[in-house]
Each structure stands twice: as C-alpha cells, then as structure tokens.
C-alpha cells in the first residue's frame, strides 16, 4: 500500500475522478509525488523507467482536463504509461509490472477501461485514434480522442500515413495529436524529421527574427505586404515544423515546455474547446526529475530493480555473454574480414548489439530510425550492388517488414543476412514483443535459409554461414544468455541443411531446434532417447530425418515457436512426402499469445522445458517407464 504520509495527495487518487477533485494549483505537487512514487516503485520492480518520468506532467494534465475514460487517450508504444497506470486504478499493483499475473508492461484493453488501445510496437497511435474518432463521429458522439506519440515514434512512415489521412478528411475528425518530443526512441532518435523538430527549440529566436523583420520591412513603403509574409514563412520553415503539419491539414500549436504545468493546462484547455485535427508539440526530457536517468537516458530506458539512492550499479564479476553479445562480437570480426559488410538497425542499436560496430565502423553503420520496412529494402538495394548487408532486428519487429523480406529480398534471391534477436519466448514484455511466430512465417519463404543455434559457438558459426551464403539467410536466437559454450573468435561456417546427432539412444528420437536442444539433451540422457540438433529449419536435413525415422519407433519435434506451421510441421511434411509412417509428437508454443511472465515460467507453461518434455514423452509412450514391450515399427 502507498505511504500516505510520504504521498498525501497521490494516496487520495485511485482514478482520474479523484484527481479532478484537486485545485489546479495543487497539480504541481501531485506531479512531484507521482514522479517520486514512480522512482520508488520501479526501483523495486524494474521496468520501463525514463520515458515515464518524462511525461509525468502531461499525464496529470490530460487526466485532469479530459473526462477519461469517456474521453479516450491512445498512448503510442506504451513505454511511458506507468504514470497513466498509477492514476487509473493500478497504483498499488504497479510494483508487479512485468511479473506473472501482475500489471502489464504496456497498455492492455483487457486490463483497464482506461487502456483504450493495446500497444507495444511504435507509431500506431494516430491511426488507432483516427479510427476511434471516425467511428464516434459517425454516431454523433462528440467525446474527445487524444493520441500521444513520442519516443521517436513519429519517425515511422505509418504515423505520417495517418496524419495525411486525418488532415485531408471531410468532415474533419475531432482529433488531438500530442507530439512528445524528447529527441529519443530507445537509442537517440535519428533522421531528417528529428533534425527539423530540433530546430523548433530555437523558436524564441524565430519569434525575435520575425518581429524584427516585420519592423524593418514594414517601415519601408516600397515593401509590399506579401514580401513581409514571405519573410515570415522563410524563417518559419527554417525553425518550426508547423509548416509541414499545417500543410497536412492540422492546426499546429507549440512547441511548449512539457514540464510546465500551467502552460500545459492553458494550452490543453484551448485545444479541448476547438474542433478538427490538431497537433500539440511538447518538449520533454526523458528521465526528468531523476538525475542519473537524465544523464543516461538510454541506460535507464528499461531497468532491473535498483536502489534509487545509488542508481544503476554494474554487477561485479565476469558476465556470461548473451546471444546479443555473441552477435555483436561476430559482427565486428566479420566486418574486419569483409569490407562489403554493412550493419543496419531500425532504432535498436543497444538492444540488437550494434554499439561497438557503430563506433568501429561508423561509415558502414546505418540506424534508419523506426522504419523496419525501409531497413529491409535498404539492405536489398545494397545487395544488388555487391554489398553484404546484415539487418539486426527483433523477431517481433521483423513482422513489420515481412512484405519487404518476401518482395524485395527473397524473390530477387538477394544476399541479405537477417540477425533475428529475441526469437521464441521473450518473457516479461508480453505478447507484443514475443518472437513466437517467426519460424512459421519464415519457413514458407522460397530461397530463404533459416537457422537456429543451440549454443553460442553455433550462433557464431551460423552467422558466418549466412554471410557467406549467396542468397537470403536468417539466424534466429533467443533473448538472454546461452548454455555457456565459448563462442570462439573464428569465422568458420556450417554445411547448409545439415544437422547433428547429439545423443544415440533407442526407441524414441527427440528432434530439437535452436534453444530447445539443451532441454532435449537432458531428457534424452534421463530416458535413454536419441537427440538430434536439427540446426536448420530450412532446408531440413532430409537424410538425417529419414535415417532417424527408420531407426526409431516414434519422433518428437521440439521448438520455441508456435506448433502451427513451425519447424515440426516441416518434419511431418517431409515424412509424409516420403511415405514414412511414424508416430510424431509436436511440442512447441501454443496457439495463443504469450502473456507477460519470466522466460522460465513461459517455457514451463508451454511444456518445452526439460520437465515438460519428459512429461509429454512419457504420456505419449508410457511403456518407456513401465517396461512394456516396445511399439512395433509402423509402415
């Protein structure tokens, strides 16, 4: 429960209705308490941190002035919504964020009526809010719809598609878009739009130049009024993004200080009373109010539990490398040997492991902002000219560039390597960030080689294999650390389409893909079963699969992907095509979206940890325990 002595105002707020009982003069104090409570809570639980600190004042002002949940707020991405959750009935549960059965890390419609649209990926808010506004207006409903977009999300093309649609509509939609401009996504925001928005911080200079120009030019009788207007527009276009947004059909206001409560309240009151599409540009500081986060906005984007008095403290001792670390080291080593290699990321330099590469090879490093579609086609263009592009991307974000993968890369059989991080079970970030679909949507793409490593050394070998392969290739690896196998430093490759027999047992064979191999080996040793490290999802090792099928009574496929259309389906299709009849048990992720919980919890729930695999095998073949006669070979 909240400490009412430390947070006397926040303790009185369960819902925005309670917030609205305060006088405007008290909102500054409410915001200060909310910021302090967020620091305390995330310090205990971990979670997304710096973005929420940057929108404290904006969150308070919006819930104070708008009649939420009747008026609807749509938050982009969702990194910044912990303050929103605290003010909308989840204050006393916020310390459970990202935990199993706890508060969701992003807005989730099933969790609260105040979470009007589920998010996790960026740049969807304006489209969703516009759809809401159209639907409401068609019913004669005049409730207010507000989209809050920031943290670099305005750099994505989808946001501009929605802006152009909204601004050109007749009748005009009653929509407010708030651009939370903190010059950050997770890494620093990049691109031409970011530079243009940055000029807006000099708007005071613009105002001075504008007024000075009017006085000088206006005093000259031979200067027509239109010349004064052109002077204004010239400087306006240089310093303020209003020209662009107003050309799209939006009434632009700003920029204003997003931490100035009186200015926010005054401006929002005016905009609330006006009709049509409006855009409010607010300037905020990511990590505002917590000095370590203001100084390291990337490091404090998402954190584990920490002591707010000390900040983040590096853990002593050698750190076990993650798969992301393995990729990072490999990329730099490969770049040293291959001058045609380029590294591409859609705004995920830190998360995807390109920090070192960006420093050592800045001329070959491309952060394209939140533009997954562009990233993939950019790589395709490089490949047509003999380049060796590597696209480092999360599994969940690759979904956004699927057409480009198929149309621009695979159809043309171009030499592009996809390094797919956070594949399979991801964990605390929930359904929006899970990588549980990629094997299914990659396996069906002609020309594409798809690999999944069982350990760190194999990951490095597969990356080298994909780079050397004359065509598109994908290596997908999980979040977190591997099995502890040293990755090495060489650039050796693997024969494409060849797996390996890890354990020779009897009766039943476990055909495991990627990160499930270690658990399969544990079960194989316990029950005396054969274990195959399949390595390749496409092409499958046809000879090995057929040989194993001929030597065993039954097969089990294991993968950290949905069973439907996944790697196990490929094994079944191969056996069916060859006329081989064997009982097959397919183990993998269920036909549902992952909730937020630890990776270990989710693997156990899906039955693809060692205990789950063992239980499933014994349920299907109980004679492995009872000692009853073996199954007769089928077919």
UniProtKB/Swiss-Prot annotation:
Q: Which Pfam families match?
A: DXP_synthase_N (PF13292), Transket_pyr (PF02779), Transketolase_C (PF02780)
Q: Which CDD domains match?
A: TPP_DXS, TPP_PYR_DXS_TK_like
Top-rank EC class of the record's enzyme: transferase
- Cofactor binding description: Binds 1 Mg(2+) ion per subunit. Binds 1 thiamine pyrophosphate per subunit.
One biological process GO term for this chain?
Answer: terpenoid biosynthetic process
The family database entries (PANTHER family) matched by this protein are listed as: 1-D-DEOXYXYLULOSE 5-PHOSPHATE SYNTHASE-RELATED, 1-DEOXY-D-XYLULOSE-5-PHOSPHATE SYNTHASE, CHLOROPLASTIC
Which NCBIfam families does the entry mention?
Answer: dxs (TIGR00204), PRK05444.2-2 (NF003933)
This chain belongs to the protein called 1-deoxy-D-xylulose-5-phosphate synthase
Question: Upper taxonomic classification of the species?
Answer: Bacteria, Pseudomonadati, Pseudomonadota, Gammaproteobacteria, Lysobacterales
């Amino acid at each position: 429960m909240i400490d009412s002595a430390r947070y006397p105002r926040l303790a009185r707020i369960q819902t925005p209705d309670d917030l609205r009982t305060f006088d405007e003069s008290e909102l500054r104090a409410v915001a200060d308490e909310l910021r302090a409570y967020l620091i305390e809570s995330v310090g205990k639980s971990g979670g997304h941190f710096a973005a929420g600190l940057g929108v404290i004042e904006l969150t308070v002002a919006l819930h104070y002035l708008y009649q939420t949940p009747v008026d609807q707020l749509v938050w982009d991405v969702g990194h910044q919504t912990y303050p929103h959750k605290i003010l909308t009935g989840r204050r006393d549960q916020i310390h459970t964020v990202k935990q199993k059965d706890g508060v969701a890390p992003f807005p989730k419609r099933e969790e609260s009526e105040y979470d009007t649209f589920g998010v996790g990926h960026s740049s969807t808010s304006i489209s969703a809010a516009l759809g809401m506004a159209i639907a409401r207006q068609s019913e004669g409903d005049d409730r207010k719809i507000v989209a809050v977009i920031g943290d670099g999300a305005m750099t994505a093309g989808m946001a501009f598609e929605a802006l152009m649609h909204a601004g050109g509509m007749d009748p005009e939609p009653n929509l407010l878009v708030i651009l939370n401009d903190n010059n950050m996504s997770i890494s620093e925001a990049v691109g031409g739009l970011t530079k243009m928005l940055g000029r807006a911080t000099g708007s005071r200079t613009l105002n001075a130049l504008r007024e000075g120009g009017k006085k000088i030019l206006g005093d000259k009788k031979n200067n027509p009024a239109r010349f004064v207007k052109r002077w204004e527009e010239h400087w306006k276009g240089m310093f303020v993004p209003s020209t662009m947004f107003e050309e799209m059909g939006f009434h632009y206001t700003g920029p204003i200080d997003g931490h100035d409560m009186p200015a926010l309240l005054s401006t929002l009151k005016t905009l609330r009373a006006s009709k049509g599409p409006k855009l409010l540009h607010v300037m905020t500081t990511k990590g505002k109010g917590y000095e370590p986060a203001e100084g390291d906005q990337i490091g404090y984007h998402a954190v584990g539990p920490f002591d707010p008095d000390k900040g983040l403290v590096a853990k002593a001792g050698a750190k076990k490398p993650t798969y992301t670390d393995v990729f990072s080291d490999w990329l730099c080593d490969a770049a040293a040997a291959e001058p045609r290699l380029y590294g591409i990321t859609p705004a995920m330099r830190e998360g995807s492991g390109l920090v070192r590469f960006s420093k050592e090879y800045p001329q070959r490093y491309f952060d394209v902002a939140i533009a997954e579609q562009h990233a993939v086609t950019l790589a395709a263009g490089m490949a047509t000219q003999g380049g060796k592009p590597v696209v480092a991307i999360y599994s969940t974000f690759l979904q956004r560039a699927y057409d480009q993968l198929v149309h621009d890369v695979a159809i043309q059989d171009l030499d592009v390597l996809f390094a797919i991080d956070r594949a399979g079970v991801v964990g605390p970030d929930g359904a929006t960030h899970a990588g549980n679909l990629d094997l299914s949507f990659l396996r069906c793409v002609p020309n594409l080689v798809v690999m999944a490593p069982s350990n760190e050394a194999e990951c490095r070998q597969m990356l080298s294999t994909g780079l050397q392969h004359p065509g598109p290739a994908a290596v997908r690896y999980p979040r977190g650390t591997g099995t502890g196998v040293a990755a090495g430093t060489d650039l050796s490759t693997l024969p494409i389409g060849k797996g390996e027999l890890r354990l020779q047992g009897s009766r039943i064979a476990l055909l495991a893909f990627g990160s499930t191999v270690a658990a399969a080996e544990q079960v194989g040793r316990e029950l005396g079963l054969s274990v195959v490290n399949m390595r390749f999802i496409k092409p499958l090792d046809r000879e090995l699969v057929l040989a194993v099928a001929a030597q065993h009574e039954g097969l089990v496929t294991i993968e950290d992907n949905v069973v439907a259309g996944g790697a196990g389906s490929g094994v079944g299709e191969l056996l069916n095509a060859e006329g081989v009849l064997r009982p097959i048990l397919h183990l993998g992720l269920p036909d549902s979206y992952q909730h937020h919980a630890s990776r270990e919890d989710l693997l156990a729930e899906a039955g693809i940890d060692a205990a789950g695999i063992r239980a499933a095998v014994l349920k299907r073949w109980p004679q492995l325990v009872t000692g009853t006669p073996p199954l007769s070979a089928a077919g």
